[in-house]
């Protein structure tokens, strides 16, 4: 290490982990399947920085992937395992902006990637408070994108889904399945029987398009034209 520059961050999307230099060693951050939501009822009042029981079995596939990619990682041993909570929202985006129903109360939280968006979020929030509106369209992170449909069971299912999707490919306009269908109109079943392929907006199921004869009633996400193009 002596005389060498600091190692850059490594990311392996297939094995779903990142690795970077930390205090003279390497830190491995895996994003595993099946990570359970915690603090659904909120943390205790005296909770500050609580760590949970180590669970190396759950991390084994990611550790094996890291050793395959960086063989030296398998030779140095594990000094410490941190298993703690990380803040997530149902869609994985932070929550920045004015709170529902409260005057002069602003929210800036849900930053699951740490300080990455700190500068931009602080900048836009300051403009919002001082000037009355932000320079950038903040609709994607607005607290008001969630309504009273976002119950605790909904939040649990969607937060677990958002965490498990961090390292997979994200397609344009994809509609994720957890906690759905949640709110449906009286004609939902009729539209479904007519071939509707549904999306979700503000908790409501609504048709994105209707599958034609012989077409599977399911979207196939793509960076090009998916099957909705032929139907429409």
State where each predicted segment sits.
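Generic secondary-structure signature for well-ordered alpha-helical cores
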Residues: 68-75, 127-134, 146, 196
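Glycine-rich loop(s) and the adjacent beta-strand/alpha-helix scaffold that form part
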Residues: 1-11, 136, 140-145
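Glycine/proline-enriched, intrinsically flexible loops and inter-domain linkers
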Residues: 136-137, 143-232
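Hydrophobic alpha-helical scaffolding
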Residues: 49-56, 111, 115, 177-181
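Active-site lid/adjacent beta-loop-alpha segment flanking the redox-cofactor pocket in flavoenzymes
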Residues: 2-104
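Short, glycine-/Ser/Thr-/acidic-enriched flexible segments
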Residues: 24, 33-34, 101, 112-114, ...
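Internal hydrophobic alpha-helix adjacent to the cofactor/substrate pocket in enzyme cavities
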Residues: 117-139
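Short pre-catalytic strand/loop immediately N-terminal to key active-site residues, enriched for Gly-Thr
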Residues: 106-109
């Amino acid at each position: 290490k002596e005389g060498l520059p600091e190692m850059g961050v490594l990311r392996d999307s297939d094995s779903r982990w990142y690795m970077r230099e930390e205090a003279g060693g390497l830190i491995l951050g895996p994003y595993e399947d099946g990570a359970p939501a915690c603090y659904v009822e909120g943390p205790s009042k005296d909770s500050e920085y609580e760590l949970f029981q180590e669970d190396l079995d759950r991390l084994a596939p990611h550790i094996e992937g890291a050793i395959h990619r960086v063989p030296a990682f398998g030779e140095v041993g594990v000094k410490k395992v941190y298993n703690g909570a990380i803040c997530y929202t149902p869609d994985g985006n932070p929550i920045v902006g004015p709170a529902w129903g409260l005057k002069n109360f602003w929210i800036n939280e849900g930053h699951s990637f740490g300080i990455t968006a700190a500068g931009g979020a602080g900048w836009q929030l300051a403009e919002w408070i001082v000037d009355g509106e932000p320079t950038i369209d903040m609709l994607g992170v607005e607290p008001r994108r969630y309504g009273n449909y976002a119950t605790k069971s909904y939040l649990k299912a969607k937060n677990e889904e958002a965490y498990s999707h961090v390292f997979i490919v994200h397609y344009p306009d994809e509609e994720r399945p957890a906690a759905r269908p949640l709110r449906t109109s009286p004609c939902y079943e009729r539209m479904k029987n007519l071939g509707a392929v549904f999306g979700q907006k503000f908790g409501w199921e609504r048709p994105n398009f209707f599958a034609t004869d012989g077409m599977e009633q399911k979207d196939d996400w793509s960076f090009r034209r998916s099957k909705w193009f032929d139907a429409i």
